[in-house]
């Protein structure tokens, strides 16, 4: 079901027909709500979720709330898939870095090999470790994330250390 939804959504990306609805969003309340929503699922899985907001209360951005939620959910879903420690940890940090807001989602999972890092946002790309894993995804989730972020005028990148974890920044 999820694969079909992702493929359908990706076909909309290919034809530039993603239905965006841009509105002013209060950064503080929006990301707090997202973290609370995701936190319930993390708690039921025994994963510790940290939420750190370093943005002033009144900061607003123009964004599509639904599509940004898709971004957050896809990134966190990937983090959960590749957590390999007895105690999984995912941290969400929101920072004001001058002219824009930066979101960081960090996990303590298995990490991504340096050779794979440049390609993780490519359509259908899957790392060697995910190809051999029953938990491996379709390989389009992060390409969807990248397109949404770019359509919002932003950029996304990742840093990672094998055996330590991964950080997604956008």
Regions found by a protein language model. Give the residues of each.
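Conserved micro-motifs of the catalytic ATP-binding
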Residues: 15-20, 60-63
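A conserved beta-strand-to-alpha-helix junction within the catalytic ATP-binding
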Residues: 21-39
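Short conserved segments within the C-terminal catalytic ATPase subdomain
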Residues: 41-52
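Short helix-loop "hinge" at the ATP-lid/N-box region of the Bergerat-fold HATPase_c
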Residues: 79-80
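Acidic ATP/Mg2+-coordinating residue in the GHKL
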Residues: 107
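Short conserved segment of the HATPase_c
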Residues: 112-126
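Conserved glycine-rich
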Residues: 153-154
